[in-house]
Curated annotation (Swiss-Prot):
Belongs to the RemA family. This is Putative regulatory protein Amet_2791. InterPro entries: RemA-like. NCBIfam families: MtxBflmRegRemA, PRK04323.1. It comes from the Bacteria. It comes from Alkaliphilus metalliredigens (strain QYMF).
Length: 93
């Protein structure tokens, strides 16, 4: 079984197969989605107190906040070596 994992910053990792969208948090509709997820208890804040730069929407309706730029997360998602890096770090631990 080969599960691709994506580093979303500060050692936080998300399964690539669960990601539906990676968007910027600037627009009003995304801010509403974040607030609704917070009220439902479906918000995961992975920013470590830093500014939110990317909002990741998952297929389970969880909303994940990341301090990494959306372009960076997308690049890691599309990178073939990203999974190898995560596997290597998992073997070391």
């Amino acid at each position: 079984m080969n599960i691709k994992l994506i580093n979303i910053g500060f050692g936080n990792i998300v399964s690539a197969s669960r990601i539906v969208a990676i968007v910027s948090p600037e627009s009003a509709p995304i801010k509403r989605i974040i607030q609704e997820a917070r009220e439902r208890g479906m918000l995961i804040d992975a920013t470590y107190g830093r500014r939110t730069r990317a909002v990741i929407v998952t297929d389970s309706d969880h909303i994940i906040l990341s301090a990494v730029q959306p372009e960076t997360v997308a690049h890691r998602l599309n990178s073939k070596d990203a999974n190898k890096e995560v596997e290597a770090s998992a073997e070391i631990e």
